[in-house]
């Protein structure tokens, strides 16, 4: 004892006894802690004497540290004590244990760094296999040691892709090159599924690298290294020397570290799959055998301790959902009732070898056969427990029974005195409204006119008879239902009398309980012991099977548990037998069936993170909505989700829930909007009595189609993902969903229809939830009718809150203010601002447009001009002088309040229109002068060039349409245009349209036509033939004219177009002609503009032409077709085309060369894109030094030569499909083969070679492809065989993607064929001949034929070209008289030849070349392939 106590001496012991055990705690270290530590060390066979020195403490800590993570509490306490003791020895000042442990760790980290530094100084060679410097100073590679590889293999074998694998891989691959990393991956290549996932990640990252690091154009400078591509980093297209050079260059490119990072990304994905955090993460790997997947699935399930029911449900849903596509198809075909053994048998051989089959099948049969040990009384997926609320004082946390507050008088439910709550007869199935009454009958009875689809959302228990075996959800109970069944409201506990074993008992109907549990009762028959979990913990019960029980007069037989339960419970096992349902009274309206768009599934959008206060607000809102039956909780079986968020209400601290239904709206069927616009007060007839009502919670009163509810699912997340989110779905029409307005409007119309029929004297205007009710009844009678209407709506579940019930004028309705004999818009205030943003101006224009309905003369054209172009909402826009003036005028107009009157059907409508200038018009519609029904404005220009008459007709049509909508008839028009002007326009203008009856009103400014075009040529006037031409590339152009009197003129223009030059030519003719002129053009565009006689235009050029036309006395404009040999037209065409229009033979060569230098596209793409002959396109490729890599395809690119095919085996429905893809065209040949053997593969290959020219086959390293039989078949058929490179991004890419495509098509046609082999051939036919796209927009079948035919033609042409190449060409440039050459002849056309001089490819006209034979130096004769043309 003394020895142990002497660990610390005097001063140190005082320090020890001042240190607290916990931060802020009262207890401090004492001598007893040292004695305890000594004894513990002895127990762990450590020397207690080590405690006496700081060095000894350090040694103890070194021993204890590795055990802390997995050790017991005692070890942790011992570690803490020793750490504190170390600090005392070292005289480090600490206040408590926590601080001591932190100080200790700091010391350790410092010493560790020192050790590492010392190790680095003493040796320049890493422990693994980095790049090292040899004696000559060269950087050489020290190969990876077998010991390291062995360690890596053991890690994978022992840890099987658990999270520890990643740090171990990182440590073992320190300083590795890509080649080393690939060696490590190849040693564990047997894990096919994992390697496939890793390969996909590497491919993705390599592609991303290439995207972010594009290749620099041009050749690499001498002595400079090329930049690594994605496949170089992955070690597939780079040599070890290149990798070392990159890693050691200055600055270095750490290709090893980059590749290692990619592999770790892939390993992370694999770890997530093999060591999932939750059951939802357990997914089957791409090539993982189904049995291995099941094994992992159940291992995790067993760890989660779920009840057997939950496990069964997971097997049926999650196991199928998360299987790979091959297995999923099979599992779905088996149907929902398949056992686990059936599933595993069916999936045998799919995705890989079934090496665990027998063992696993036996294990699984034991798992599923054994009875579950723990049966939870309630489901595992319940939400948090609801807090108790006191009926008496209203506070949470206690019941009324235990309430200390003075007892409240009267009933706690209805508030009336004279009875207690348990005797209350008041019906309050009130889940949606403040006050829901059913005045026409007893609780739960609806009048006979109300038919209803019995939704399982009425919150009452309804028991259906045994003679009527219906489903639990009540899906079959459509239409009218008799309400004679017992209904039990949930305002009290649903207690009923039951009869069991000849005894009467009182029991609680509990839809939340799985089992029926009764307190001590003697029942006949055998029983077995069982444990069940309830709210208060576990209880022991006796289980009796096949017991008859009578509930509410209906008999059921099932399992009954007997034990010490606080209350008798009838659970779901018996309630479902008697057809008991839980119902909510939302609205007794029939639901409107809704579907998704064909071929679409529901939304699966992830919920984004939300702040804590938003989550709390949403939880409160949703709890309230759930109580009211608007939404219901759902389990994880619903795969759909829509994101939600919360915003604060305007001028309030309350939150509002918003659901982002954009994705669901895209997928939901389209609806026909019942109402096409909003009602207008000018169309209201004058009524004696008026009332305005508002329907409260409008959408939430209408039920949503049951089958559609699942698609409205949303999730409230938890803070820091503490628990799974709470999932809900809507039972009613959601706000923000596209179907809600249409369904609500049609439901409201149906409900109001009987009331409208019974009360024809009452006018009801309905727009969404706003109701305008008018009548000519006395106010007392009118209000009685209003109450009847409110009652009628209430019967259907719609409340009309008093708060929004307007009885006295002025009535605020739809943004209008209604008085008994007049109406106006609600007051409008235009803001005064120093600076205006785009958003401010948008709001301002909106207000002015709204005001223009009754305030005449409002203009917004100049304000709208400020908003042109794409501007940010917050961008400040300076007001132009015109806009400021317009705004000031509008302010003046709005100063005086203006009112409109109501419509009198006995009087005519009159519309008067005035021109305001600047293309703006104002109008008034009235029945009596100076008493406007409404006003408005028109300022739309339907084209760049217009005139007043055209605008006037457009305005009239707008007013006529508006009148038909509001009053059902067109008004008489008073227009500021003379009849003669109108007649002239209407007869001449081919686009003129009908306008209604009208009369002339002399309101200046009058509308007139400013000039007229003649119908016949003007005799004696000069005729101008005009034309214009422009070059699209250079944007240079010419315009001009030729006259019948020999005059001509051509003017050049820059930055122009063909259309502009045509108009420029007309402008020239008008400027240079007299007062009378004939103009002939070949431009339909120019003719169309001028024939419409515009008097204003947005185009400056057209405005100049209008000015010239107004000055003329007579103008005749005619059109002739271009290039048809018409005298003057042909002359002027030649004039303006010179040097502008250039028709060059093969003028795409330069562009093709430029594009090839940038993108190095293949000859076929150039031939297609630039319309070049294949030989010229191939020559461009041949003259490119980067594209000449020994005739092979460039690294990392798929070789698309015509004879190359890729082959691969894929699996579907337990069978093997051998797929061959013609790489260049995407054409497929596929067959179901009996077995994946070399014999079958060789036979398929010979069949393929017999149909198509096969030069090369590219396959993976599968045993069937590497077999001797296939090699023999390839040798016989003269086919070269190539194999894929491991981890090469493009190695088997074409056939892999075709496998997916083929399976997708098979899935689409599978139900049309009995056998898989038939479906495969159908899919091949569809792919080859019914799907078009890619180069040329062909189908794959057309493309392969085209490619093979082109190849044959090219070979033939090549033979001719070899002959042509025996000729040499001497040529002259346009301005240089000296003959150049000899050049090589590439192509001979009709008017030009294509030659190659050094590396330049040129197009030279035939008249400027001399073609001679190489040997003879004489001119080529007529018999030669390239006969000579006449020279200039």
Curated annotation (Swiss-Prot):
Its cofactor is Mg(2+). Residues 628-818 form the Reverse transcriptase domain. A zinc finger (Integrase-type) spans 1147-1188. A motif (Nuclear export signal) lies at residues 16-22. InterPro entries: Aspartic_peptidase_AS, DNA/RNA_pol_sf, Gag_p24_C, Integrase-like_N, Integrase_C_dom_sf_retrovir, Integrase_C_retrovir, Integrase_cat-core, Integrase_Zn-bd_dom_N. Residues 811-819 are annotated as: RT 'primer grip'. Residues 8-43 are annotated as: Interaction with host CALM1. GO terms for cellular component: host cell; host cell nucleus; host cell plasma membrane; host multivesicular body; membrane; viral nucleocapsid; virion membrane. Residues 7-31 are annotated as: Interaction with Gp41. Residues 186-224 are annotated as: Interaction with human PPIA/CYPA and NUP153. Residues 73-77 are annotated as: Interaction with membrane phosphatidylinositol 4,5-bisphosphate. GO terms for biological process: DNA integration; DNA recombination; establishment of integrated proviral latency; proteolysis; symbiont entry into host cell; symbiont-mediated activation of host apoptosis; symbiont-mediated suppression of host gene expression; viral genome integration into host DNA. Residues 12-19 are annotated as: Interaction with host AP3D1. The record marks 129-130, 360-361, 374-375, 430-431, 438-439, 485-486, 584-585, 1024-1025, 1144-1145 as: Cleavage. A lipid is attached at residue 2 (N-myristoyl glycine). Residues 1367-1414 bind DNA. This is Gag-Pol polyprotein. It comes from Human immunodeficiency virus type 1 group M subtype D (isolate NDK) (HIV-1).
């Amino acid at each position: 004892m003394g020895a142990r106590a002497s660990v610390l001496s005097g001063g140190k012991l005082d320090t020890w006894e001042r240190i607290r055990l916990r931060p802020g705690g009262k207890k401090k270290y004492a001598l007893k802690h040292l004695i305890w530590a000594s004894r513990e060390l002895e127990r762990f066979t450590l020397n207690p004497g080590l405690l006496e020195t700081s060095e000894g403490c350090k040694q103890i800590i070194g021993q204890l540290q590795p055990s802390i993570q997995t050790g017991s509490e005692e070890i942790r306490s011992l570690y803490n004590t020793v750490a504190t003791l170390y600090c005392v020895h070292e005289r480090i000042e600490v206040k408590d244990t926590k601080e001591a442990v932190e100080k200790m760790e700091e010391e350790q980290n410092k010493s560790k760094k020192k050790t590492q530094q010392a190790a680095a100084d003493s040796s320049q060679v890493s422990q693994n296999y980095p790049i090292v410097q040899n004696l000559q100073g060269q950087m050489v590679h020290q190969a990876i040691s077998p010991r390291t590889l062995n360690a890596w293999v053991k890690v994978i074998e022992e840890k099987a892709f658990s999270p520890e694998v990643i740090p171990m891989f990182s440590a073992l691959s320190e300083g590795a090159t890509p080649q080393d990393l690939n060696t490590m991956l190849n040693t564990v290549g047997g894990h096919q599924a994992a390697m496939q996932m890793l390969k996909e990640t590497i491919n993705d990252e390599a592609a991303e690298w290439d995207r972010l690091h594009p290749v620099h154009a041009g050749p690499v400078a001498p002595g400079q290294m090329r930049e690594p591509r994605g496949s170089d980093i992955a070690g597939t297209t780079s040599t070890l020397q290149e990798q070392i050079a990159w890693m050691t260059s200055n600055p270095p490119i750490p290709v090893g570290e980059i590749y290692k990072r990619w592999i770790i990304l892939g390993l992370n994905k694999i770890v997530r799959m093999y060591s999932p955090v939750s059951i939802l993460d357990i997914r089957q790997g791409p090539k993982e055998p189904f049995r291995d997947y099941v094994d992992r699935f159940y291992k995790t399930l067993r760890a989660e301790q779920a009840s057997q029911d939950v496990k069964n449900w997971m097997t049926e849903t999650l196991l199928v959902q998360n299987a790979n596509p091959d297995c999923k198809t099979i599992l779905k075909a088996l149907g929902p009732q398949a056992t686990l053994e059936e599933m595993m048998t069916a999936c045998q051989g799919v995705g890989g070898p079934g090496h665990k089959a027998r063992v696993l099948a036996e294990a699984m049969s034991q798992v599923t056969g054994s009875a579950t040990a723990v049966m939870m009384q309630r489901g595992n997926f319940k939400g948090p427990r609801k807090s108790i609320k006191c009926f008496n004082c209203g506070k949470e946390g206690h019941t009324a029974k235990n309430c200390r507050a003075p007892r409240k008088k009267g009933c706690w439910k209805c508030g009336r005195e004279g009875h207690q709550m348990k005797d209350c007869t008041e019906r309050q199935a009130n889940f949606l409204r403040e006050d829901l009454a059913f005045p026409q009958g007893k609780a739960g009875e609806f009048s006979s006119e109300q038919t209803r689809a019995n939704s399982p959302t009425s919150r009452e228990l309804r028991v259906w008879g045994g003679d009527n075996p219906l489903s639990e959800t009540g899906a079959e109970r459509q239409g009218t239902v008799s309400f004679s069944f017992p209904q039990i409201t949930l305002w009290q506990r649903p207690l009923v009398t039951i009869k069991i074993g000849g005894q009467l008992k009182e029991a609680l109907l509990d839809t939340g309980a799985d089992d029926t549990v009764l307190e001590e009762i003697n029942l006949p028959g055998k029983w077995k012991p069982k444990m069940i979990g309830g709210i208060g913990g576990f209880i022991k019960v006796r289980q009796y099977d096949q017991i008859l029980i009578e509930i509410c007069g209906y008999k059921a037989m099932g399992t009954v548990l007997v034990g010490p339960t606080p209350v008798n419970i009838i659970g779901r096992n018996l309630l479902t037998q008697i057809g008991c349902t839980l119902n909510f009274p939302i609205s007794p309206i029939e639901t409107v069936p809704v579907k998704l768009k064909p071929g679409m599934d529901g939304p699966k959008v992830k919920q984004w993170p939300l702040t804590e206060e938003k989550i709390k607000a949403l939880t409160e809102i949703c709890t309230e909505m759930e109580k009211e039956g608007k939404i219901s909780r759902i389990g994880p079986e619903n795969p759909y989700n829509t994101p939600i968020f919360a915003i604060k209400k305007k001028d309030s601290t309350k939150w509002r829930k918003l659901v982002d239904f954009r994705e669901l709206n895209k997928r939901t069927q389209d609806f026909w909007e019942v109402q096409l616009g909003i009602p207008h007060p000018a169309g209201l007839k004058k009524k004696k009595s008026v009332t305005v009502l508002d329907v409260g919670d409008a959408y939430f009163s209408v039920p949503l189609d049951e089958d559609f509810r699942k698609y409205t699912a949303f999730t409230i997340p938890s803070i820091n993902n503490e628990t799974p989110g709470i999932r809900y779905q809507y039972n009613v029409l959601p706000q923000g969903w596209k179907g809600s307005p249409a369904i609500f409007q049609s439901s409201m119309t149906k409900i109001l229809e009987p009331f409208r029929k019974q009360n024809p004297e009452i006018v009801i205007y309905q727009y969404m939830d706003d109701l305008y009710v008018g009548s000519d009844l006395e106010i007392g009678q009118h209000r009685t009718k209003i109450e009847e209407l409110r009652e009628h709506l209430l019967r259907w579940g719609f409340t009309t809150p008093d708060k929004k019930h307007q009885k006295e004028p002025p009535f605020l309705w739809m943004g209008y203010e209604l008085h008994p004999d007049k109406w106006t818009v609600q007051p409008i205030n235009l803001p005064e601002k120093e600076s205006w943003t785009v958003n401010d101006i948008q709001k301002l224009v909106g207000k002015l447009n709204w005001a223009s309905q009754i305030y005449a003369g409002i203009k917004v054209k100049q304000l709208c001009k400020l908003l042109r172009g794409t501007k940010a909402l917050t961008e400040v826009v300076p007001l132009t002088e015109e806009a400021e003036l317009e705004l000031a005028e509008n302010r003046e107009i709005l100063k005086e309040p203006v009112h409109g009157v109501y419509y009198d059907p006995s009087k005519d409508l009159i519309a008067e229109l005035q021109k305001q200038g600047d293309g703006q018009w104002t109008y008034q519609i009235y029945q009596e002068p100076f008493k406007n029904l409404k006003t408005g404005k028109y300022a739309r220009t339907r084209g760049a060039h217009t005139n007043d008459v055209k605008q006037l007709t457009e305005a009239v049509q707008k007013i006529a349409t508006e009148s038909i909508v509001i009053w059902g008839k067109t008004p008489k028009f008073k227009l500021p245009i003379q009849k003669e002007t109108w007649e002239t326009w209407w007869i001449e203008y081919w686009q003129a349209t009908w306008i209604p009856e009208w009369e002339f009103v002399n309101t200046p400014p009058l509308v007139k036509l400013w000039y007229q075009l003649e119908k016949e040529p003007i005799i004696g006037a000069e005729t101008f033939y005009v034309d214009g031409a422009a070059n699209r590339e250079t944007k240079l152009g010419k315009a001009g004219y030729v006259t019948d009197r020999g005059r001509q003129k051509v003017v050049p223009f820059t930055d122009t177009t063909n259309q502009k030059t045509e108009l420029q030519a007309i402008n020239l003719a008008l400027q240079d002609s007299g007062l009378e002129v004939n103009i002939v053009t070949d431009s339909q565009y120019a003719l169309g503009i001028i024939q419409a006689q515009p008097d204003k235009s947005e185009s400056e050029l057209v405005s100049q032409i209008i000015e010239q036309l107004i000055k003329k006395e007579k103008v005749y404009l005619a059109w002739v077709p271009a290039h048809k040999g018409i005298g003057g037209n042909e002359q002027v065409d030649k004039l303006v085309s010179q040097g502008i229009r250039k028709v060059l033979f093969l003028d795409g060569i330069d562009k093709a060369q430029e594009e090839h230098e940038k993108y190095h596209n293949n000859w076929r793409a150039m031939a297609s894109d630039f319309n070049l002959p294949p030989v010229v396109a191939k020559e461009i490729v041949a003259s490119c030094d980067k594209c000449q890599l020994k005739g092979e395809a460039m690294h990392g690119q798929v070789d698309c030569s015509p004879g190359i095919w890729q082959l691969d085996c894929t699996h579907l429905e337990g069978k093997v499909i051998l797929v061959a893809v013609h790489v260049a065209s995407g054409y497929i040949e596929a067959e179901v083969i009996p077995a994946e053997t070399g014999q079958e593969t060789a036979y398929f290959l010979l069949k393929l070679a017999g149909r198509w020219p096969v030069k090369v086959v590219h396959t993976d390293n599968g045993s069937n492809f590497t077999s001797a039989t296939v090699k023999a078949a390839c040798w016989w058929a003269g086919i070269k065989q190539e194999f894929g490179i491991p981890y090469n991004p493009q190695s088997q890419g074409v056939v892999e993607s075709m496998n997916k495509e083929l399976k997708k098509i098979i899935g689409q046609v599978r139900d049309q064929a009995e056998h898989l082999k038939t479906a495969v051939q159908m899919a091949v036919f569809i792919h080859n001949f019914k799907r078009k796209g890619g180069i040329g927009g062909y189908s794959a079948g057309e493309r392969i034929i085209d490619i093979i035919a082109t190849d044959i033609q090219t070979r033939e042409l090549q033979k001719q070209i070899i002959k042509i190449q025996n000729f040499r060409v001497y040529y002259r440039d346009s301005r240089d008289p000296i003959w150049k050459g000899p050049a090589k002849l590439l192509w001979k056309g009709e008017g030009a030849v294509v030659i190659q001089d050094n590396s330049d490819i040129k197009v030279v006209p035939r008249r400027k070349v001399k073609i001679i034979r190489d040997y003879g130096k004489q001119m080529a004769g007529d018999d030669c392939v390239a006969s000579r043309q006449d020279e200039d």
